[in-house]
Amino acid sequence: MKLAERTAADLRFARAGAHTVLTRRRHRWPFVIGRVFADPQDPGLGTLTLQNAAGTVIPGDVIRQRIEVVDGGRAAVNGQGATLISGVPGGDASAEETELYVDAHSWLRFDPAPRILTAHARHRQRTEVCVAHRGCAVVVDAVVLHPDLDAATFGSIESTVTVRSPGGALLAMDAQVLDAPPVTGRFTAFGTVYFVGAGFTGGHHEGPTDPPGVYTAVTELPNGAGCAVRIAAADGGTLRTYLRLLSAETAFQRASTRTFTDGMPFRRSQV
């Protein structure tokens, strides 16, 4: 993916001594980049909150970002909270384009927080992930439907996550589209957590029991790229709680091979 010159955030993390630090920090509106915090229990892990000063994405917005983790760095990049996707009748679609790169022996968790789809909003997300041998990335993609949405005001949200090798070869592509209200009102929040790279594969073990209001399933990605944990939840709060509980160890060691039934609301394609 070729990012345009006016990328909103261009960040590089690397290991420096016992810590992970930012070695490249370029950003503009709407992002605000603060400091990297070290975990007292795990000083090698650096955590950064990627703040959207606008707090919303409006029709016509195109937000591009690139994040790299190199030289054995271990970084967790989180959003400051759920972001509204605004819309107007007949308005332009908005878009977010993200490029993630993790080199050998480095680790990244990217959790930008759920997007909240509001009336008439049309939004596209494109995320490209490249993980070198012995590196790993955990990528969270989540959306919550605003409770006031109905068939007359429902717009659309499209999300495509692509996994490529360092040489550019396509390993996996997962595309999801939601352009109408779910058939039932049981689930209004949806997420997928992608575990890409060293050691992440779908297994044949029974997964943990789903908590009330949550349905989960695990998909093994093609070409040994990793696995994806799909989540449907009753609401945004339930989804966020489950995302916090979900760990890489759980997905790797206790992944199940269940798949969603045809009644799930997203149309999905995977190659």
UniProtKB/Swiss-Prot annotation:
Keyword Cytoplasm: yes
Family affiliation: Belongs to the UreD family.
Job of this protein: Required for maturation of urease via the functional incorporation of the urease nickel metallocenter.
Coiled-coil annotated residue ranges, if any: none
Entry GO MF terms: nickel cation binding
Quaternary structure note: UreD, UreF and UreG form a complex that acts as a GTP-hydrolysis-dependent molecular chaperone, activating the urease apoprotein by helping to assemble the nickel containing metallocenter of UreC. The UreE protein probably delivers the nickel.
GO cellular component terms given for this protein: cytoplasm
Stored InterPro entries: UreD
Main location: cytoplasm
Record organism: Mycolicibacterium smegmatis (strain ATCC 700084 / mc(2)155) (Mycobacterium smegmatis)
Subcellular location: Cytoplasm
Keywords recorded for this protein, A-Z: Chaperone, Cytoplasm, Nickel insertion
Name this polypeptide is given: Urease accessory protein UreD
Domain of life: Bacteria
Keyword hit for Nucleus: no
Pfam family, one: UreD
